[in-house]
């Protein structure tokens, strides 16, 4: 029994060590439009040696539409060039937002559970309707385990605020803003009810 606990502790520490480091991922263009090819360039840190031992690496992009509750996973094989891993992808036409992780199928770099994110833009250069809202929802900490981002309600409120500034008629974003503000204590129960009635 003690041996099992000891092994579990060691494995837990090892897992935490793997998760405490993150490489860097650059996505270009910075503000991609619908149908535009997105270039990925990943640089691993020395601490990612265990992940690199089982190459080749691939990127998994979880693409969100404004309507669907769950994302679509898109896998991209990465090719090693001059110490960097590169690849390219075109996201589905109805995608508004995506988060990315890089790995070998067993071990993934999730950027310390923050992932890397891509907001799709329209022809005017603005985030597509729903992009900031999906970025906010990703921070609720309620996505399926393979793409669960660390929760951050302060950042979620910032993204919801951006969404309602760009798209003041997005009722779902307004509803979520009130709901999160109430759960963080920024709004009282009565204040939240009053704002719900205004929608």
Give the residues covered by each predicted segment.
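Positively charged n-region of N-terminal signal peptides that target proteins for export
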Residues: 1-6
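Bacterial N-terminal signal peptides
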Residues: 8-18
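Glycan-association/targeting regions that enable binding to alpha-glucans and other polysaccharides
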Residues: 21-199
